[in-house]
Amino acid sequence: MNTEEIPVAPPLRGVTPALQWKVNNYSFGTRQARKLFPHYHPPTWLGNLYLPLRGMPHTGPGCYAAATDWNGLAYNLSKVPTSTKGYAIGARTAVRFKPISKDVTPYPGMYQKVDTLSEKHKKSFAPFNILMPRFRSAAKGDSYPGPGTYNPEMKSVPKVTWPMKFGSPDWSQVPCLEKRTLKAELSADKDFRKHRSRVAYFSLYYQ
C-alpha cells in the first residue's frame, strides 16, 4: 500500500507548505494488469530460456526456432530410449491412433452405393423362413437302398415274443415253476425252461 504527498494550500514564496499524507489503495502505484509468466516473460536470461505460451516473437508462421533447448525437460523426455514391446519400465506400446493415409480414406460419393430402400425383396413362403434342406448331403452309395428295394408285403422273420408288462415279460401269463424256499437250481428247472423255450419257438410255425 503506497502513500503520496498532497499539499493542503498553494505554496508561498519562502514558506514551506503543510503536507498531508493520503493513503493510495493501488498496489505498486499502478492500475494496469499484472503481467504473469504463462503469457508474459521478463527481459532476462530466465525469461529468454522459458518462453511464454505465445512463442518466440522473432519467428513467423511456418518457421522453426533457430535455437533448440537441448537441456530442456520436454526435449529430454521426448528422447528417452524406451522399449516398444512393453517389457521395461516406462515402455511404450503401439500407437493408439495410427495415421490414416488420404489414399485410404473414402472419397465423396463412396458411401451408399447400393440403395436398399428401392430394392424389393421376394417373400418367403417357407415356415419360419427356413429354406435349408433337411439333409445336408445327399445319401448316394451302395450301402443305401434305392427306389423299389422295400417290399411292404414281404413278411419279416418270426421271432419269439413274450407277453410284456411295462417293458418286461409278464411272468404271470407264462408257465413258471413253483417258488421254493431253496434257491438252489435243480436239473429239473433247466429242463423245464428249455422245454418252455422250445414250445414257444414251435408255436410260431405250428398252431
From Swiss-Prot:
Principal location: cytoplasm
UniProt KW keywords: Cilium biogenesis/degradation, Cytoplasm, Cytoplasmic vesicle, Golgi apparatus, Nucleus
Subcellular location: Cytoplasm; Cytoplasmic vesicle
Pfam families: SHIPPO-rpt (PF07004)
A GO BP entry: positive regulation of kinase activity
Entry GO MF terms: beta-tubulin binding; gamma-tubulin binding; kinesin binding; protein kinase binding; small GTPase binding
GO cellular component terms, semicolon-separated: ciliary basal body; cytoplasm; cytoplasmic vesicle; Golgi stack; nucleus; trans-Golgi network
Expression across tissues: Expressed in tissues rich in ciliated cells, such as lung, kidney, vas deferens and testis. Both isoforms 1 and 2 are expressed in testis.
Top-level taxonomic group: Eukaryota
Subunit structure: Interacts with proteins involved in ciliary transport, including ARL13B, CETN1, KIF3A, RAB6A, RAB8A, TUBB1 and TUBG1. Interacts with AURKA.
Protein role: During primary cilia disassembly, involved in cilia disassembly. Required specifically to control cilia retraction as well as the liberation and duplication of the basal body/centrosome. May act by stimulating AURKA activity at the basal body in a cell cycle-dependent manner.
Full protein name: Ciliary microtubule-associated protein 3
Protein's organism: Mus musculus (Mouse)
Source species taxonomy: Eukaryota, Metazoa, Chordata, Craniata, Vertebrata
